[in-house]
Amino acid sequence: MLFEDIYTKHRDLRVHIDSPVAYNMFCNYFVKTLADTYNEGPLVIMCIGTDRSTGDALGPLVGERLHKVCKYAKVFGNLEEPVHAVNLEKVLDKVQSTYKNPFIIAIDASLGRSENVGTIKIAPGALKPEIGR
């Protein structure tokens, strides 16, 4: 199967939002990655960014929607209370002190090359700020 081949060869997925298979690839890869890495701790979704910086509002916009519909995870970061470079460490400390062994999913925008505009990337592991991980 194509998806299984992609997953076993690469530990991350990059797909353009305009691809006709983007939704299916994203969902399948996300579920597979979550199944392989989830530690059974409380689920925390960290939506990183700010609408005060051009190109950095993805996290807070997603967080705004997730706050309304997400019942099984604690969501940090939205338009009213963004999580960004200035307060990220403080928010992470709060998460670590509030939840025992949290499983954190991060949603963040990345500025990069023009040919990567519209590309979604899913990868296990930590975000590495300012290096386009």
Label every PLM stretch briefly:
Residues M1-I104, A109-R133:
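N-terminal catalytic or cofactor-binding beta/alpha core of small enzyme domains
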